[in-house]
Amino acid sequence: KIISIDELHDKLEGMRDSDLILDVRTPEEFSSGHIQGARNEGHESVAGIADELKSYGTVYVHCKMGGRAKMASEALENSGLTNIVCVGNGGMERWGQMGWPTE
C-alpha cells in the first residue's frame, strides 16, 4: 500500500502505540529534523530488521521524497512482512514545506 505524506500527517493523531514511523533517510538527514517518534534505519539495511518489525501493527516507511521509501518497503515486503505502508509521495521535503513539526 502507498500513501502520501499528507495522509500520514492526517493519521498521526489516531496512531496506535503499536504503529511505527520508519524514516529510511541517512542518519545525517534524520538528525537535521524528523517526525516526532520516528525511528531511523537506512534504506539499504532495513531487511536486517524485518523480524523486529513484525511485532508492530503498521510500519509507515518514509524518506525525503519517496524513492528510498519505495525501495525499503519492497525489501521489507519481500522479507515476508504484511504490515508495511509506503509513504511514497512527498516525504520530508513536503513535510518541511508544510511547516509541520519535527524533532
What spans do the regions from the language model cover?
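Short, surface-exposed ligand- or partner-binding patches at beta-edge/loop junctions that are enriched
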Residues: 61-63
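Rhodanese-like catalytic fold shared by cysteine-dependent sulfurtransferases
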Residues: 1-20, 27-58, 67-103
